[in-house]
Amino acid sequence: MDSQDCPCAAGGTCTCGDNCKCKNCKCTSCKKGCCSCCPAGCAKCAQGCVCKGPPSAKCSCCK
């Protein structure tokens, strides 16, 4: 499995799943959100977003 570095600090909630490739994810200000549906390069998604869902699926930020 790919290296996953997604430590969640107290006071924050992380959306990074077990199979996400988030590096140094700070939950209070997670800049590398793991989107399950947004296509790679989605300008509205967090930069460095690791997308695991099918390209046919779109989340609210991409609609």
UniProtKB/Swiss-Prot annotation:
GO terms for biological process: cellular response to cadmium ion; cellular response to copper ion; cellular response to zinc ion; detoxification of copper ion; intracellular zinc ion homeostasis. A divalent metal cation 3 binds at residues 16, 20, 25, 30. A divalent metal cation 1 binds at residues 6, 8, 22, 25. A divalent metal cation 4 binds at residues 34-35, 45, 49. A divalent metal cation 6 binds at residues 38, 42, 45, 62. A divalent metal cation 7 binds at residues 51, 59, 61-62. A divalent metal cation 5 binds at residues 35, 37-38, 51. Keywords: Metal-binding, Metal-thiolate cluster. GO terms for cellular component: cytoplasm; nucleus. Residues 31-63 are annotated as: Alpha. Residues 1-30 are annotated as: Beta. Class I metallothioneins contain 2 metal-binding domains: four divalent ions are chelated within cluster A of the alpha domain and are coordinated via cysteinyl thiolate bridges to 11 cysteine ligands. Cluster B, the corresponding region within the beta domain, can ligate three divalent ions to 9 cysteines. Metallothioneins have a high content of cysteine residues that bind various heavy metals. Belongs to the metallothionein superfamily. Type 1 family. This is Metallothionein-1. It comes from Columba livia.
